[in-house]
Curated annotation (Swiss-Prot):
Organism of this sequence: Shewanella denitrificans (strain OS217 / ATCC BAA-1090 / DSM 15013)
Membrane topology note: Multi-pass membrane protein
Main location: membrane
Activity control note: Na(+) is not transported, but it plays an essential structural role and its presence is essential for fluoride channel function.
Gene: fluC
Pfam family, one: CRCB
Name this protein carries in UniProt: Fluoride-specific ion channel FluC
Reaction(s) this enzyme catalyzes, per UniProt: fluoride(in) = fluoride(out)
Family: Belongs to the fluoride channel Fluc/FEX (TC 1.A.43) family.
């Protein structure tokens, strides 16, 4: 039951952060490309790499994993929004933007998980 509370707490923080980052990115760059979703997915992937690597090299409590890994990062990142925004770009005829969105999200997110892990592993 305690872990559920940690997931809920982290999730509420992550959801609010995602919302705020999306608003900021729209204000900075407009809404013609889903930069907000890309940003939260890339940042979330980086921190997920850190959380995973910390769990490999030291003891990370189940509560911290629930709070940060499942809750905060789970709510911060969003595959469903990425998928919906990509489909909307396609439906609007922006095939190149949709392809760029897919390539950037997938490649940058995988790279950022790796980078986060390497940051931790290089310090052990």
């Amino acid at each position: 039951m305690t872990n559920l509370l940690f997931v809920a707490l982290g999730g509420s923080i992550g959801a609010v952060l995602r919302y705020l980052m999306s608003i900021i990115m729209i204000q900075l760059f407009g809404s013609s490309f889903p930069f907000g979703t890309l940003l939260v997915n890339v940042l979330g992937s980086f921190f997920m790499g850190i959380v995973y690597a910390l769990g490999q090299v030291s003891h990370v409590s189940p509560e911290l994993k629930a709070l940060v890994g499942v809750g905060l990062l789970g709510a911060l990142t969003t595959f469903s929004t990425f998928s919906n925004e990509t489909l909307l770009l396609m439906q609007q005829g922006y095939w190149f933007k949709s392809l760029i969105n897919v390539l950037l999200n997938v490649s940058l997110c995988i790279f950022m998980v790796y980078l986060g892990q390497q940051l931790v592993f290089s310090r052990v």
